[in-house]
Regions:
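Surface-exposed beta-strand/loop patches in extracellular or lumenal glycoproteins
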Residues: 79-96
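C-terminal beta-strand-rich structural cap/linker in extracellular carbohydrate-active enzymes
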Residues: 28-51, 60, 86-88, 112-142
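Catalytic cores of secreted or luminal carbohydrate-active enzymes
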Residues: 2-65
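Short strand-turn-strand beta-turns centered on an Asx-Gly dipeptide
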Residues: 101-105
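A short tyrosine-centered beta-strand micro-motif
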Residues: 97-100, 129
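A generic structural signal for short, non-catalytic loop/turn and secondary-structure boundary residues
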Residues: 9-11, 16, 71, 81, ...
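Beta-strand-rich interaction surfaces with strong enrichment in secreted/lumenal proteins
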Residues: 65-68, 75-78, 108-110, 119-123
Length: 142
């Protein structure tokens, strides 16, 4: 399973990867620039947290590694890796319905809270899960 030993990096496909769930002590890296934005990562075995321009973007408990995270106007996609199941919280638009797809299947349609946070769990079990969180279109069946 991949861990990001340098804590955060850019990928050739225009995405970012971050997190190292193997670390026993909390480790941080600040001021990582990507596409004009500044990122800050805090990661270790109990937690992985990513901030973009000093605002919350991603958090998992326990810690995870995330590969190929991309943000679009429709939502976000990434692959989460970890030694056990994880609770993930991401920043979205406030009070908006989102489809949560895990490994290509719609798991849930969920509304982000007033602050825009959306939480869900992923079954990793010493593996990975491909996650897509996309704005739910009105009239679409879940």
């Amino acid at each position: 399973m991949p861990v990001i030993t340098d804590l955060i990096r850019t990928e050739a496909d225009g995405s970012i990867s971050f997190g190292n769930y193997e670390l026993k002590a909390k480790t941080k890296k600040s001021d990582f620039e990507f596409e004009g934005d500044l990122y800050k990562i805090k990661t270790f075995n109990e937690l992985t947290r990513l901030e973009k321009n000093e605002l919350f973007l991603y958090e998992s408990e326990p810690g995870t590694a995330v590969t190929h995270m991309k943000e679009t106007a429709e939502g976000m996609s990434f692959t989460a890796w970890g030694p056990e199941d994880a609770q993930i919280t991401i920043q979205c638009e406030p009070e908006t319905d989102y489809d949560i797809l895990i490994d290509g299947e719609i798991r849930d349609v969920q509304k982000s809270n007033l602050g825009g946070k959306l939480s869900f769990s992923v079954k990793l079990g010493d593996g990975s899960a491909k996650v897509q969180v996309l704005k739910h279109e009105a009239g679409q069946q879940a």
